[in-house]
UniProtKB/Swiss-Prot annotation:
Species this chain originates from: Homo sapiens
Catalytic activity, reaction form: 1D-myo-inositol 1,4,5-trisphosphate + ATP = 1D-myo-inositol 1,3,4,5-tetrakisphosphate + ADP + H(+)
Quaternary data: Interacts with DMTN.
Summary of the function given for this chain in its UniProt record: Catalyzes the phosphorylation of 1D-myo-inositol 1,4,5-trisphosphate (InsP3) into 1D-myo-inositol 1,3,4,5-tetrakisphosphate and participates to the regulation of calcium homeostasis.
Protein name listed in UniProt: Inositol-trisphosphate 3-kinase B
């Protein structure tokens, strides 16, 4: 095994030497020149042998010849030859680096675990032989990849309609889940990836390393060490400015060979060894290196295409077959579609955001080669993983999964970080989690892996598509530098290329999905261009992922990535509807729990019907049938969840109304005690809507400029709602907590003189009024009325006034609602002063302070009425005094209901305290008020002091 990698390293050195001899000069990427030929390169303390302190001496570069004939052959057969001979290259089965227990699980039938041993380079002849084999395999891979890329181009055109086949992830047995892959990945590519997956076997350094994919190097676009070198345990090739010690080789060295992405590079490019410098952590950072994530050990097949596509983005001249993606194949595809599109399809799997810059071989599309951000790995080592300035973090929606090298982590943390892929990051491959995320290692040593894949994040110079590499680890941290990557010239890719979160066929993935309670949109990931825009616009309303509960069983926040154009928005309903959350996030409409609209009959704090008949109507529905406030609030929130049949605008309206819904339903069941069904509606900001009445509107307009204004509800004009006009006024109950309410109808009559005159002109028999009469007093109807079983309206109105305290005291109690919600309207026969006093005592519970407050308020109203211009020139009929108090001993009285209040002819006035005679229009309002004051005064004097 070590022999293969050693031969490959030697090939890189020799290619660099040949380029120098041929005057290749630095490539467009500004790569430095590799070590000169004939010089032995010492790489002490290589990360491939941590802690051993052994130094490796590389022979002169020209001792090895990279020029070997390439013989065609099946990739699988060549791979088998590589694997079968891996143990004999070094002459000792113990010469390979040991592998973690989970390394190579992707192909369990070909798992290889070899004991750690001292790495000793073989002779040049052996290296040449192995190099020939390697070159043949690379050529085969190149051919397969070209075919896969061509198929990918074809598949991209139809991916908007069909869901692509999933990668071969079924055999993955790693405790960590398989990463996402682009939903538009064509099946052809999957086959190539599946074949290459056999390549992953062991890690390259002491700590546990993931079966790293070429994604890291592919994303970087830079040539990286073949993963076969890693598997063989070969020491890394010292690159230009190759770091010493632990930084000799970073996890980013894992590359194409692991993925089976060898390239047929054209010799002469001095960029071969840049991966060492870019991918390597700075000295002393090895302790901070994150263990490679088993998360992606099961799905490294994806990295191959990522590398292949990313590397094709620049006019570079790759130098080493083993180190660079076959730029020929990628370059052929440049004409077919832009490089970013390629990166988009391949690089879109969860957390796979390494430094996704296109091949560092050269600037892309004319961008300057020096264009790259400098990020810092978690340990403080400078890594070029920072995204370029200008990348939009709002679009970052791919959640980064917290990775862990042990089986214990599993997927318990996934729900809080998981989110669907956003539009831009889907294309560029930038990791995101509803905001800015960076994985930093907080566990045992390892190398900082790029995007959970194992590789030092590095931004490629000359790549306009620089993305932040995110060192993997257990903790998700905000990455402030995410704001820096905005000038990505992302090409418009077919809708199918948008990343759709798709678990694929992996049993492990499906299992972990169930375990974590993940909610997916199991669509093809196809999104139209407009859909992405709408999702971005609606994303402002989404909470950031870090606010989500960490419970894996709870549905997590994410953006829907389904073919539906309805933005998927989840607003947590306080944990009461978790069971249905999965279906809702998948876009399935909810047929249950519709929002119960407020009953208009439970809607007013101010006033009862001024019509005489209405005051006699029984309640058609139980006032207690109104929604429970908590239930109403939860139902309102429940409506905010995504439903195909609901628009975002309606959802926002529900949010706007919900606070009032809760308070409104808590306070208003009592309103029906006077029979006001359909008269009121709720309004926002502490107001209510009462059905429009011209007479009442005129009175309210005048009262707003009268001295009585402090004693009437504030009027705010009329509004139109649901096609009807309403008078908008203050909610008088807004300042009370669990109020007790009483309505007293004022005056010695509750009907207008003109109503009586009109009824007499055309008397009509009313069976309904007869029924009401006999319910109160069966002996009240005359014999004639009993025979007809009907009475006229004038007869009923006059009789009605005689049976209650209206005729005797100038007012009557319409109804009482107590703080416990009980309602009593049985005051039709409350006629005597003693009966009224008893009703008030029950209403106030004899509370002295409340009685005093009511008495004083009534006196203030009486004093104001005596000087009010409005009161003098109006016949006040059917108006009420509304008594309200609560457990805090707040007590107020207001004048309400002016629907029957009629202005007098010019120059006429009323005294309001003289008996009524037909034609004098006296209403007896002050008579009733005086009696109320007297009763409350007596009660306050008799009541014990609190």
């Amino acid at each position: 095994m070590a022999v293969y990698c050693y031969a490959l390293n030697s090939l890189v050195i020799m290619n660099s030497a040949n380029e120098m001899k041929s005057g290749g000069g630095p490539g467009p990427s500004g790569s430095e020149t590799p070590p000169p030929p004939r010089r032995a390169v010492l790489s002490p303390g290589s990360v491939f042998s941590p802690g051993r302190g052994a130094s490796f001496l590389f022979p002169p570069a020209e001792s090895l010849s990279p020029e070997e004939p390439r013989s065609p052959g099946g990739w699988r057969s060549g791979r088998r030859r590589l694997n079968s001979s891996s143990g004999s290259g070094s002459g000792s089965s113990g010469s390979s680096v040991s592998s973690p227990s989970w390394a190579g699980r992707l192909r369990g039938d070909r798992q290889q675990v070899v004991a750690a041993g001292t790495l000793s380079p073989p002779g040049p002849e052996e290296a040449k032989r192995k190099l020939r084999i390697l070159q043949r395999e690379l050529q085969n891979v190149q051919v397969n990849q070209k075919v896969g890329m061509f198929e990918a181009h074809i598949q991209a055109q139809s991916s908007a309609i069909q869901a692509p086949r999933s990668p071969r992830l079924g055999r993955a047995r790693s405790p960590s889940p398989c990463p996402f892959r682009s939903s538009s990945q064509p099946p052809g590519r999957v086959l190539v990836q599946g074949a290459r997956s056999e390549e992953r076997r062991t890690k390259s350094w002491g700590e546990q390393c993931p079966e790293t994919s070429g994604t890291d190097s592919g994303r970087k676009g830079g040539p990286s060490l073949c993963s076969s070198q890693v598997k063989k345990g070969m020491p890394p090739l010292p690159g230009r400015a190759a770091p010493t010690g632990s930084e000799a080789q970073g996890p980013s060295a894992f590359v194409r060979m692991e993925k089976g992405i060898p390239a047929s590079p054209r010799c002469g490019s001095p960029t071969a060894m840049e991966i060492d410098k870019r991918g390597s952590p700075t000295p002393g950072t090895r302790s901070c290196l994150a263990p490679s994530l088993g998360l992606f050990g099961a799905s490294l097949t994806m990295a191959t295409e990522v590398a292949a596509r990313v590397t094709s983005t620049g006019p570079h001249r790759p130098q080493d077959l083993a180190l660079t993606e076959p730029s020929g194949r990628a370059r052929e595809l440049e004409d077919l579609q832009p490089p970013e599109a390629l990166v988009e399809r391949q690089g879109q799997f969860l957390g796979s955001e390494t430094s996704p810059a296109p091949e560092r071989g050269g600037p892309r599309d004319g961008e300057p080669p020096g264009k790259m951000g400098k990020g810092y790995l978690p340990c403080g080592m400078p890594g070029s993983g920072e995204p370029e300035v200008g990348k939009r973090p709002e679009e970052t929606t791919v959640s980064v999964q917290s990775a862990e090298s042990s089986d214990s982590l599993s997927w318990s943390r996934l729900p809080r970080a998981l989110a669907s892929v956003g539009p831009e990051e889907a294309r560029s491959g930038a990791p995101v989690g509803g905001g800015r995320w960076q994985l930093s290692d907080r566990v045992e040593g390892g190398s900082p892996t790029l995007g959970l894949l194992g590789g030092s994040p590095s931004a490629q110079p000359g790549t306009g598509n620089v993305e932040a590499g995110i060192p993997s680890g257990r903790m998700l941290e905000p990455l402030p530098c995410w704001d820096a990557a905005k000038d990505l010239k992302e090409p418009q890719c077919p809708p199918g290329d948008r990343v759709g979160v798709q678990p694929g066929n992996s049993r492990v993935w499906q299992g972990t999905m169930e375990k974590a309670g993940l909610a997916w949109t199991r669509g093809t990931g196809v999104q139209s261009e407009g859909t992405w825009e709408s999702q971005r616009q609606d994303s402002d309303a989404l909470p950031s992922p870090e606010l989500l509960p960490q419970d894996p069983d709870k549905p997590f926040l994410r953006k829907a990535c389904s073919p539906s154009n309805i933005p998927a928005v989840i607003i947590t309903d306080m944990g009461t509807q978790e069971d249905g959350a999965l279906e809702e996030t998948q876009g399935s409409p909810r047929g249950n729990l519709p929002l119960r609209k407020l009953s208009s009959s439970s809607a007013s704090s101010t006033g009862f019907s001024s019509s005489y008949e209405d005051s006699e109507e029984d309640i058609s529905s139980d006032p207690e049938r109104t929604l429970d406030p908590n239930s109403a609030f939860l139902h309102t929130l429940d409506q905010q969840k995504p439903r195909v049949s609901k628009s975002w605008r309606k959802i926002k309206n529900m949010v706007h109304w919900s606070p009032f819904v809760m308070s409104f339903k808590k306070k208003y069941p009592w309103i029906q005690l006077a029979g006001h069904a359909g008269s009121f509606k709720a309004a926002a900001n502490g107001r209510i809507l009462k059905k429009h009445c011209e007479s009442e509107q005129r009175c309210l307009d005048r009262l707003m400029v009268d001295v009585l204004r402090p004693f009437v509800p504030a009027y705010h004009g009329d509004v139109v709602k649901d096609g009807e006009r309403y008078n908008q006024m203050d909610d008088l109950l807004a300042d009370f907590d669990s109020p007790c309410v009483m309505d007293c109808k004022m005056g010695i009559r509750t009907y207008l003189e003109e109503e009586l005159t009109k009824a007499r002109k055309k008397p009509s028999l009313r069976k309904d009024m007869y029924q009401k009469m006999i319910e109160v007093d069966p002996e009240a109807p005359t014999e004639e009325e009993k025979a007809q079983r009907a009475v006229t309206k004038p007869r009923y109105m006059q009789w009605r006034e005689t049976i209650s305290s209206t005729a005797t005291l100038g007012f009557r109690i319409e109804g009482i609602k107590k703080e416990d919600g009980t309602v009593n309207r049985d005051f039709k026969k409350t006629k005597t002063r003693e009966q009224v006093t008893e009703a008030f005592r029950e209403f106030t519970k004899g509370n002295h302070n409340i009685l005093i407050a009511y008495r004083d308020r009534l006196k203030a109203i009486r004093t104001t009425l005596e000087v009010s211009p409005f009161f003098k020139c109006h016949e006040v009929i059917g108006s009420s005094l509304l008594f309200i108090h609560d457990k805090k001993e707040q007590a107020k009285v207001w004048m309400i209901d002016f629907g029957k209040t009629t202005p007098l002819p010019e120059g006429q006035t009323l005294q309001h305290d003289v008996p009524w005679q037909e034609g004098n229009r006296e209403d007896g309002y002050l008579s009733g008020l005086n009696n109320l004051v007297d009763i409350l005064t007596e009660m306050s004097q008799d009541a014990p002091l609190a």
